[in-house]
Amino acid sequence: MKNLIVVTGGCGFVGSNLIEHFLKKTKLQIISLDNYSSGTIKNHIKNKRVTYLKANTINISKVLKKRKRYIQAIFHFGEFARIYQSFLNMNECIESNSMGTHAVIKFCMENKIKLIYSATSASLGNKG
C-alpha cells in the first residue's frame, strides 16, 4: 500500500508548511528530505508520522531505495532557492537545481511515483 509522501526541502518554509498541512488533513506517513542549505531544524514538526532525512536530492534513489514501493508522491521543493547566493555559489546551485531535480524526475519515472514540482525564484533570475 502506498501510504508515504516525500517532501524534498521539507525543512524550508514551503516544505514545512506542506508537511503541517498533510499532518492535519491526511493519515499519510511523511519523509522530509533536506540538505539543510537553507532549511532549518527549527522547522521540524514533532510528530511520529514524519521522518527527517539529511540528504541531497542528487542521491534520492539511494536514500529512498528501501521505501520506494510505499511512496505515493514526491513534492519537490528541495532546491537552492536564493537568487543572489545562487550566483555566488553557482556549482552548488547547478548541482541542486539541475542535477538534483533530474535525479528526482528520474526516480519518479522509474518507480511510477507522482511528482509535484515547484520551481524556485532562483530559476527565474533577478528579473523573475
Name these PLM-found stretches.
Residues 1-128:
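N-terminal Rossmann-like NAD(P)+-binding domain of SDR-like oxidoreductases, especially those catalyzing
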